[in-house]
C-alpha cells in the first residue's frame, strides 16, 4: 500500500506496528521486580485484536471472513453510550509479532482496486481494535485502542475500472 495505508501499516515505521510494539514493550516493563524470597503476585495482561472492514454500509469481519454471523453496530445499554459491533471475532495474542501476523492475515481480505496513481488502493475502511485487560490481585483494568486505515481517497473517475455502483463511488464520487 501507499499513502494512508503505508502510514498505518508500513512494515517498520507504520503507526500500527509502532503502536503494537510500544504496547507490548510497556506491558512487559510493568512487571514489578520480585525479591528472590517472595513469590510473584499474580499479574497478567490479556491482549486481543479484532479487524473490521467497512465497505459502504456493510460491515465485514476480516479475521473470520467465512462467518455467517451478521455484524451489527449496537449500543451497550440505555445508560451507557458505548457502541460495539456484535458478532465481531477477537483473537488473543501474546506479543506484537503475533498481533501483526493476525492483522496482516486479515488484511489480505480487504477490498482493493487499482487506480492510475496506486496499484492497490483500499476501497474500504479498516478498523483494528486492540483490547487490553490487565489484572492483578486488587483490580482489573480494561483498555481499548482503535486504529483506523481509511479508504483510498481517489475519486471513482480516477479508477481504471469504474463500473457504476462500485463500492468506491459510495465513498469517493
Where are these regions (language model features)?
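P-loop NTPase motor catalytic core
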Residues: 1-173
Amino acid at each position: 500500500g501507499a499513502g494512508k495505508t503505508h502510514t498505518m501499516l508500513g512494515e517498520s515505521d507504520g503507526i500500527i506496528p509502532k503502536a503494537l510494539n510500544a504496547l507490548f514493550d510497556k506491558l512487559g516493563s510493568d512487571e514489578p521486580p520480585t525479591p528472590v524470597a517472595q513469590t510473584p503476585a499474580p499479574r497478567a495482561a490479556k491482549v486481543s485484536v479484532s479487524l473490521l472492514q467497512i465497505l459502504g454500509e456493510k460491515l465485514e469481519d476480516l479475521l473470520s471472513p467465512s462467518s455467517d454471523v451478521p455484524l451489527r453496530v449496537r449500543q451497550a445499554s440505555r445508560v451507557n453510550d458505548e457502541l460495539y459491533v456484535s458478532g465481531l471475532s477477537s483473537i488473543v495474542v501474546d506479543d506484537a509479532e503475533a498481533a501483526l501476523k493476525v492483522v496482516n492475515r486479515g488484511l489480505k481480505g480487504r477490498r482493493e482496486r487499482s487506480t492510475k496513481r496506486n496499484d492497490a488502493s483500499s476501497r474500504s475502511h479498516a478498523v483494528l481494535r486492540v483490547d487490553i485487560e490487565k489484572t492483578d490481585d486488587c483490580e482489573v483494568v480494561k483498555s481499548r485502542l482503535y486504529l483506523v486505515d481509511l479508504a483510498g481517497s481517489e475519486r471513482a473517475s480516477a479508477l481504471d475500472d469504474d463500473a457504476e455502483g462500485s463500492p468506491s463511488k459510495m465513498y469517493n464520487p
